[in-house]
Amino acid sequence: MNQWDQFLTPYKQAVDELKVKLKGLRKQYEVGENTSPIEFVTGRVKPISSIIDKANKRGIPFDRLHEEMYDIAGLRMMCQFVDDIDVVVDILRQRRDFKVIEERDYIRNTKESGYRSYHVIIEYPIETLNGQKHILAEIQIRTLAMNFWATIEHTLRYKYDGDYPDEIQHRLERAAEAAYLLDEEMSEIKDEIQEAQKYYTQKRAKKHEND
């Protein structure tokens, strides 16, 4: 096992464990027949090339990565509606299996690029052969519309190294505004949407019972 494998193994363990736990939250809502504020959960460990690039840009030595780079372990929690994000953040604050050490609200404080999301930095303990180890992880909570925009912007940022042509920058700004308006409109009819989803779920369950 090389140096990078040894370094990243605890992060992979943390992501795997956190995905199970956070997905379990959604399942608990479903079992209780309550509407879940969580649409789905994803997770990943930052690629080695991305870690090296970020470390070089910020002057972080290898032996300080575990303390100074908080997003090597990353998770995303998707919500249907903007106000679901506050619910999810409150749930994370109340967890006893990890410690919230920092929060960054890019929804009320939108980045200049148009990026919107809520970031929660946590310290998560894992058990290893050498004892307990504390891992920093970043949980991003956002709506589906926010995620669509962020995914496209992330891809373009790599292509242009963050220096967008004026036309691309203009279109990204317009797309960010459109994503914001979509979230606003969906929030206005949230009750109707959730009622329809509940009706569909119940109807599908009855169909399976009769099959």
Residue ranges and their predicted role:
Residues 1-2, 31, 35, 66-68:
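Nucleic-acid enzyme cleavage-core boundary/entry regions
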Residues 1-29, 138-211:
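An acidic, glycine-/histidine-flanked metal-binding catalytic module
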Residues 8, 32-41:
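Basic, low-complexity intrinsically disordered segments
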Residues 9, 13, 46, 50, ...:
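Charged, alpha-helix-enriched surfaces in structured cytosolic catalytic cores
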Residues 15, 19, 23, 52, ...:
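Generic solvent-exposed, charged/amphipathic alpha-helical segments
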Residues 38-74:
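A glycine-rich, hydrophobic loop/mini-helix early in the fold
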Residues 66, 81-186:
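Long beta-strand-rich cores associated with HINT superfamily self-processing modules
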Residues 77:
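Residue(s) in the substrate-gating loop at a strand-loop-helix junction
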